[in-house]
Regions:
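Anionic-ligand binding patches
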Residues: 2-11, 45-218
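N-terminal beta1-alpha1 ligand-phosphate binding loop
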Residues: 2-29
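Cofactor-binding loop segments of dinucleotide-utilizing enzymes, especially the Rossmann-like FAD-
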Residues: 16, 36, 119
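Flexible, glycine-rich phosphate/dinucleotide-binding loops
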Residues: 20, 40-42, 123
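Short loop/helix-cap segments at secondary-structure boundaries that form the rim of catalytic
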Residues: 22-26, 43, 65-66
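A local structural micro-motif
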Residues: 31-32, 209
């Protein structure tokens, strides 16, 4: 059984996303993935940025409630063009074709929300309080090129990004569809803003280097 020193609590990623797992593995290999029991629905009149932040916090707290000693990472990403209508994941080729046709020449705004939570201690109505909590939303602006149907079809043949809002993976071949990307954190668009997460882990006195060293020696 792997053990960590007392100053390094268990780290949990409240997500089953392979993209977020891959990003977190850049920082540490010592974490668990647990699926949060959260219904991901936009509330009436809720701004897309606010929805992303709410869901990130809900995911983290849903898992933290069951693992009170752990540091739990929650994240959510939403895309929009007007701030209020969320752009969903296409799910299949026909929807991805339509989404990329629609995105052609447009500027989309992606909001990647992050929550780091430990010790859900109380509930006040629907609000669950945590002993430690840090939250942030990192914005990314993506300008798409003018996309022909031929280019879209060739892209989807090579990289069927049906599980990505916007239907393109910036970390893969999808970069050829984009004219520009602007963000304070290049990892945010992939799904987990590592710059901000690193800062939050330091705030929580979680030492990435000692945690991995302890795991290697266990």
């Amino acid at each position: 059984v792997e053990t960590l020193p007392e100053q390094s609590p268990q780290l949990i990623l409240a997500s089953t996303s392979v993209y977020r797992r891959g990003l977190l593995e850049r920082l540490t290999s010592h974490f668990k993935q647990i699926s949060p029991d959260v219904i991901e629905v936009q509330k009436p009149g809720e701004a897309v940025e606010a929805m992303a932040l709410r869901l990130a916090v809900e995911k983290a707290k849903a898992v933290a409630r069951l693992h009170p000693g752990a540091l739990v990472i929650g994240s959510d990403q939403a895309a929009t063009i007007d701030g209020f209508e969320a752009i969903g994941k296409p799910g299949h080729r026909a929807a991805a074709m339509e989404q990329l046709r629609w995105a052609s020449g447009k500027t989309l705004h992606f909001f990647t929300a992050l929550a780091l939570v430990r010790g859900v201690t109380a509930e006040h109505g629907e609000q669950q309080l945590a002993a430690f909590q840090r939250t942030a939303v990192v914005g990314t602006t993506v300008k798409f090129r003018e996309l022909s149907d031929t280019l879209i079809e060739h892209y989807l043949d090579r990289e069927p990004a049906y599980d990505c809002a916007g239907s393109a993976k910036c970390e893969g071949l999808g970069i050829v569809l984009m004219e520009s990307i602007q963000s304070e954190d290049p990892t945010a668009l992939i799904g987990l803003p590592l710059i901000r997460l690193s800062q939050f882990l330091a705030d929580a006195d979680y030492d990435i280097f000692s945690a991995d060293s302890a795991a290697d020696c266990a």
